[in-house]
């Protein structure tokens, strides 16, 4: 059996959730402001509870990336896609979605596209994921390190789109 082509993008999506969930757990204020602007419940404890759930799903997906993990990651990104899409359609006054627990970029088309792509990737992974990925990676070249590298690069590029450090530096 070969490693599915969607493995690196899925692991990148899960890794981004680790960072985002951890950041929101640590700094929930910007996410709470975004939820408040949308007219949704926005208490800091509620944001932290959601961030903890996000972090649990993400860590489980990195540690044991099977079909269930893919379905859970897809559900998280589908919720993000719905939130950002609704914010754009309704013109909610959100200056930052708070994805990474601090002011980053305004929700926009790149943000929506990445969330939707991560939803598709995670859904695809849920459909094709092997139950024991370690059995696939052990005989592969360098035990999957090239795959981990590609996942890290994809995650880093997506993080740059979501947080736009150049825009923040110009402020």
Which role does the model predict for each range below?
Residues 1-171:
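Membrane-interfacial helix-loop segments of redox and metal-homeostasis proteins
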């Amino acid at each position: 059996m070969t490693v599915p082509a969607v493995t690196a993008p899925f692991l990148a999506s899960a890794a981004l959730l680790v960072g985002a969930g951890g950041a929101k757990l640590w700094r929930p204020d910007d996410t709470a402001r975004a939820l408040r602007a949308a007219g949704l419940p926005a208490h800091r404890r509620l944001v932290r509870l959601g961030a903890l759930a996000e972090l649990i799903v993400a860590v489980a997906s990195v540690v044991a990336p099977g079909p269930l993990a893919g379905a859970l990651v897809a559900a998280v990104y589908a919720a993000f896609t719905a939130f950002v899409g609704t914010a754009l359609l309704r013109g909610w006054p959100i200056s930052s979605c708070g994805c990474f627990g601090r002011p980053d970029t305004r929700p926009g088309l790149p943000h929506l596209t990445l969330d939707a792509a991560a939803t598709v990737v995670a859904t695809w992974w849920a459909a094709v994921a092997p139950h024991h990925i370690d059995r696939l990676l052990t005989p592969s070249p360098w035990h999957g390190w090239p795959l981990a590298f590609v996942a890290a690069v994809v995650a880093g590029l997506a993080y740059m789109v979501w947080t736009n450090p150049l825009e923040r530096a110009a402020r």
